[in-house]
Amino acid sequence: MAKKSKQLRAALEKIDSTKAYSVEEAVALAKETNFAKFDATVEVAYNLNIDVKKADQQIRGAMVLPNGTGKTQRVLVFARGAKAEEAKEAGADFVGEDDLVQKINGGWLDFDVVIATPDMMAIVGRLGRVLGPRNLMPNPKTGTVTMDVAKAVEESKGGKITYRADKAGNVQTIIGKVSFDADKLVENFKAFNDVIAKAKPATAKGTYITNLVLTTTQGPGIKVDANSF
């Protein structure tokens, strides 16, 4: 613990806490200040000036990052018949119906993405208390309730991320791994920022992005200039 604290202090010394860095500078600093002994995740966190209590100011969706996430996603699909076979052929890790519901209710959660065909939502709905709090519940807005299960599986395996503003207007997501080339992280960051910018509600007033931070697993937060894109 003492060694980790020393490493964090050393990393913090390289960052000017009073400065908002450009995208390129922030990515370079994130790679430089990373001290994790594993391939750390690179994440971004936005604070948006929105009121999620208003229906027209709720921000939620999904996108495929240009260079993927670097993370191997374990995909679970609720489907039957031909659609179940499509999911398996597309590379889904787990495919089933009631058997998976029982397994999940028993405490099994070894998956990262849940996809379902519309006709399966009646049984998937029984998992709301388990999947909902973990942001795993299939939803049409994120493309995880669909008849095109093959496409959904392929996108999830190929770098698809989902995002959602919480009650305080915070949106967090992964944009890659520290091992990525800096230009690939920058490209992913810019692609996600474009999505957030376009999602600005017409009724939102004042400064839209009030705070933007880039960080790595265990690493310090680096403030990013939202106008540097």
From Swiss-Prot:
Record text on subunit structure and interactions: Part of the 50S ribosomal subunit.
Disulfide bond positions: none
PANTHER family the UniProt entry points to: 54S RIBOSOMAL PROTEIN L1, MITOCHONDRIAL, LARGE RIBOSOMAL SUBUNIT PROTEIN UL1M
Domain of life: Bacteria
Coiled coil: none
One Gene Ontology term of the molecular function aspect: structural constituent of ribosome
Single GO BP term: regulation of translation
Species whose genome carries this gene: Streptococcus mutans serotype c (strain ATCC 700610 / UA159)
GO cellular component: large ribosomal subunit
Protein known as: Large ribosomal subunit protein uL1
Cross-referenced InterPro entries: Ribosom_uL1_bac-type, Ribosomal_uL1, Ribosomal_uL1-like, Ribosomal_uL1/biogenesis, Ribosomal_uL1_3-a/b-sand, Ribosomal_uL1_CS
Key words of the record: Repressor, Ribonucleoprotein, Ribosomal protein, RNA-binding, rRNA-binding, Translation regulation, tRNA-binding
Family of the protein in this entry: Belongs to the universal ribosomal protein uL1 family.
The keyword ATP-binding is assigned to this record: no
Transmembrane segments: none
Gene3D superfamilies assigned: 3.30.190.20, 3.40.50.790
Pfam family, one: Ribosomal_L1
Its biological purpose: Binds directly to 23S rRNA. The L1 stalk is quite mobile in the ribosome, and is involved in E site tRNA release.
NCBIfam families xref list: rplA_bact
